[in-house]
Amino acid sequence: MGNVFEKLFKSLFGKKEMRILMVGLDAAGKTTILYKLKLGEIVTTIPTIGFNVETVEYKNISFTVWDVGGQDKIRPLWRHYFQNTQGLIFVVDSNDRERVNEAREELTRMLAEDELRDAVLLVFVNKQDLPNAMNAAEITDKLGLHSLRQRNWYIQATCATSGDGLYEGLDWLSNQLKNQK
């Protein structure tokens, strides 16, 4: 009987954990986002070869965020990070019109993976501070997000350097985690 109360108490008050995989094409802003969330400041980044991993505490949830390099030569390695991923953050450079179709292809390929079938999808439309940036509606269309009928997804306009939109995205992720059984 005590076990029932312990489980109830943990579900109501215990810290939840969520494993997040953050991917996207190179130079989309993934590492800048990770360290803005972790440290609250802008860090000087270099292209990620391999990965960065940090734990971000937010609203009683411990997000373990894996930031995986996005250069085309290392994208085949993304699949090694899929296992046990509950949330996928796909970062798009909203100013990079030439590569938005490439981003769509990579996202489509990933979402077809069986290991990610239950992962929720958060798309960060990054670099909204730039004058020619595509807005969230335009990116939704270009990525074909409306065709994702079997997946819970959300799109959020962001600016990694100022932090705009990042916590709104984490709010959505935390609500998804709370709604999971």
UniProtKB/Swiss-Prot annotation:
The keyword Plastid is annotated on this UniProt entry: no
Disulfide links within the chain: none
GO CC terms in record: Golgi apparatus
Covalent lipid sites (N-myristoyl glycine): 2
Keyword check for Nucleotide-binding: yes
Entries under CDD domains matching the protein: Arf1_5_like
GO molecular function: GTP binding; GTPase activity
Record localization: Golgi apparatus
Short name of any one Pfam family annotated for the protein: Arf
InterPro entries from the UniProt entry: Arf1-5-like (IPR045872), P-loop_NTPase (IPR027417), Small_GTP-bd (IPR005225), Small_GTPase_ARF (IPR024156), Small_GTPase_ARF/SAR (IPR006689)
Residues that coordinate or bind GTP: 24-31, 67-71, 126-129
Chief localisation class: Golgi
Keywords carried by this UniProt record: ER-Golgi transport, Golgi apparatus, GTP-binding, Lipoprotein, Myristate, Nucleotide-binding, Protein transport, Transport
GO biological process terms, semicolon-separated: protein transport; vesicle-mediated transport
Its job: GTP-binding protein that functions as an allosteric activator of the cholera toxin catalytic subunit, an ADP-ribosyltransferase. Involved in protein trafficking; may modulate vesicle budding and uncoating within the Golgi apparatus.
NCBIfam families in alphabetical order: small_GTP
Protein family according to the UniProt entry: Belongs to the small GTPase superfamily. Arf family.
Name of the molecule in the record: ADP-ribosylation factor 2
Organism of provenance: Mus musculus
